[in-house]
Amino acid sequence: MSEIQQLQQQIRAFRDQRDWMQFHSPRNLAVSISLEASELLEHFQWITDEKSSKQVAEERRTQIATEIADVAIYLLELSDNLGIDLKQAIEAKLQSNAEKYPVEKARGSSLKYTELQ
């Protein structure tokens, strides 16, 4: 069993012990991912990139880690509930991105793949 599957198993057990599956529809989990991601963003709102990389990351490391974990938990549960192999999905997406953004065209560029020449 992979580490991802082990985490999904722990999340499933936590959820099932509390009889929360009834609330964890794919729609509700997707909404929860967005809400938790917004809570993560609040830690970086209205500050410079430099401050977000150093000062805030150090000052709020615990709170930021908690919000990242919240997003990850809902993401792992959503993929589990939908029968999506998250490792496989990530690897497929990385391969797709590698094809869309070849190193020789994309290095140092923030352009969308349709704009790369």
Model-derived segments and spans:
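Flexible "arm" and connector segments at domain edges
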Residues: 1-117
